[in-house]
Amino acid sequence: MKAVIIVEPEQPENIGFIARLSENFNFKVRVVRPKFNLKESRTTANNAQEKLRNTEIFETVEEAVKDLEFVVGTKPGKGVNSKNFEFRENTSIMLGRESSGLTKEELNYCDALVYIDADYNSLNLSHAASILMYEAYDSKEPGVDNSRLNFIEEEYGPRLKQLISRANPTKEEIDRLLGELK
């Protein structure tokens, strides 16, 4: 399953637009602590009203990502240029508040970080979502089971697992790495 997770959105219009995008690119919509009633997003959701009704609301980022296989977070200038990132079929996307993005703590729940290369480092939330959801949708790479790296977390700690995850290794690279470590 892949989802787009929006943390503390401030503008209802953006959630309506993101519901429409999710309908087009086959993402589930998850929202963490919205600053408004989601019903306010109806006008921009157009024909994605059912997607909007099925939007899941969470109290914490941890709850929103716990059942997802691979989560990519966004931060201007941090991580990998989204054009060069190898999105996989199980990649979920997490975006932050319109005014300030994701916090450092929230980024810790991400397996990888990407940024969108642009002349100005701030995009509208729904516009950023559209670029990343299209790039993920366009990907033909099979998903990598990130849970296979749990051995590394148990043996060497969460930081090493996070470092390896953020490198976005292929299945073959994970197989090779696990073979060397065991």
Language-model region placement:
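Post-transcriptional modification and biogenesis factors for structured RNAs
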Residues: M1-K182
